[in-house]
């Protein structure tokens, strides 16, 4: 369910649903403020680096990064950054990447960049090695060849987890938790436990981002979130308590 909610929110950000326009007629700036009770260090979402704890949820939720595959409403896998994939029936997977995708850093998303990303993920994430069982990644143009330690029919499902967001690990701000992904938005400012400000990725490969600026405000609890929404201080809410 969380994956579907995240995907729905990311789609809304691409279309600009719920945003508001500032004064100025045709040139009005379209902005959105989202209150979020989950985007905080206490919840292990202190940055948007998917290779750290559970930060991948914020990375994908707010349109910064994308995964090789994603889940449909019926929880089936469909292509995203990968065009196709196949398995030899044993330990070897062949993944063909989309063409003409560029990271927000300006780097082309080719197999070499994805190999580097996956290797960094396996070195730094606590769950990815045991989930994926990847022992080798080879790159050739837009084709990845992935080898696992044992047959793993669920490999592509795991690569659709938010920790599988494909990012440019050579980007300048990477070590500060600010990543360059392939999504429709780029991090402008990140202040942990306070706010995240995003602007459009002008090189986005799959449509035109509809918001000129997106701000995520970290709010402490559901009551604060609900009050802010009712007061009009935020345009949307994420992490509201179920009652």
Residue map of PLM features:
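Ligand-site clamp/hinge motif
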Residues: 203-243
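Surface-exposed binding/hinge segments that line
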Residues: 86, 129-169
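Short, well-ordered beta-strand elements
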Residues: 28-39, 92-96, 114-117, 144-146, ...
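Short, solvent-exposed loop/turn elements at domain surfaces
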Residues: 28, 40-51, 75-78, 154-157, ...
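Short, low-complexity disordered leader/linker segments with a strong preference
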Residues: 1-32, 39, 44-46, 76, ...
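Aromatic- and charge-enriched surface segment that lines or borders ligand/interaction sites
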Residues: 83-125, 228
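N-terminal lobe/hinge region of extracytoplasmic solute-binding protein
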Residues: 35-88, 180-181
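Gly/Pro-rich hinge or "lid" segments in bacterial periplasmic/extracellular proteins
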Residues: 54, 159-209, 213, 223
């Amino acid at each position: 369910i969380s994956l579907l909610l995240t995907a729905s929110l990311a789609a809304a950000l691409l279309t600009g649903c719920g945003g508001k326009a500032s004064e100025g007629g045709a040139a009005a700036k379209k902005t959105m403020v989202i209150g979020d009770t989950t985007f905080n260090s206490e919840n292990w979402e202190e940055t948007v680096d998917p290779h750290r704890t559970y930060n991948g949820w914020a990375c994908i939720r707010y349109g910064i990064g994308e995964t090789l595959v994603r889940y449909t409403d019926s929880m089936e896998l469909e292509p995203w950054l990968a065009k196709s994939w196949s398995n030899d029936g044993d330990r070897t997977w062949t993944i063909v990447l989309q063409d003409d995708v560029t990271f927000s850093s300006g780097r082309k998303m080719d197999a070499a960049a994805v190999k580097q990303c996956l290797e960094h993920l396996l070195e730094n994430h606590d769950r990815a090695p045991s989930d994926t069982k990847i022992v080798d990644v080879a790159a050739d143009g837009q084709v990845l060849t992935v080898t696992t330690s044992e047959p793993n029919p669920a490999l592509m499902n795991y690569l659709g987890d938010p920790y599988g967001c494909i990012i440019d690990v050579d980007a300048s701000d990477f070590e500060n938790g600010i990543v360059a992904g392939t999504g429709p938005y780029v991090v402008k400012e990140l202040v942990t436990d306070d706010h995240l400000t995003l602007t459009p990725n002008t090189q986005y490969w799959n449509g035109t981002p509809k918001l000129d600026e997106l701000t995520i405000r970290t709010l402490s609890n559901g009551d604060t979130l609900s009050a802010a929404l009712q007061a009009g201080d935020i345009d949307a809410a994420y992490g509201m308590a179920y009652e």
